[in-house]
């Protein structure tokens, strides 16, 4: 399953919508995705979204789609 993770680059500052970034990860569950991101980055995770087939196709066509691996 492919997940889209919305995050802020730092946990120190208050989150701002304009600074939200995203990355894509393949994993068996959102819990695993959250663990991997928390263990390997200083990011403040806002939301972990499971991408369905249509949403994934859209992201692959229209976004800077790259799977992140740790």
Swiss-Prot record:
Record's keyword terms, sorted: DNA-directed RNA polymerase, Nucleotidyltransferase, Transcription, Transferase
Organism taxonomic ancestry: Bacteria, Bacillati, Bacillota, Bacilli, Lactobacillales
Protein name: DNA-directed RNA polymerase subunit epsilon
Cysteine disulfide links: none
Domain of life: Bacteria
GO biological-process terms attached to the record: DNA-templated transcription
EC numbers, comma separated: 2.7.7.6
Gene for this chain: rpoY
Function: A non-essential component of RNA polymerase (RNAP).
Quaternary structure and interacting proteins, as annotated: RNAP is composed of a core of 2 alpha, a beta and a beta' subunit. The core is associated with a delta subunit, and at least one of epsilon or omega. When a sigma factor is associated with the core the holoenzyme is formed, which can initiate transcription.
Family as reported in the entry's similarity comment: Belongs to the RNA polymerase subunit epsilon family.
Pfam families the UniProt entry points to: RpoY
Reactions this protein catalyses: RNA(n) + a ribonucleoside 5'-triphosphate = RNA(n+1) + diphosphate
Family matches, as InterPro entries: RpoY
Gene Ontology CC terms: DNA-directed RNA polymerase complex
GO terms of molecular function: DNA binding; DNA-directed RNA polymerase activity
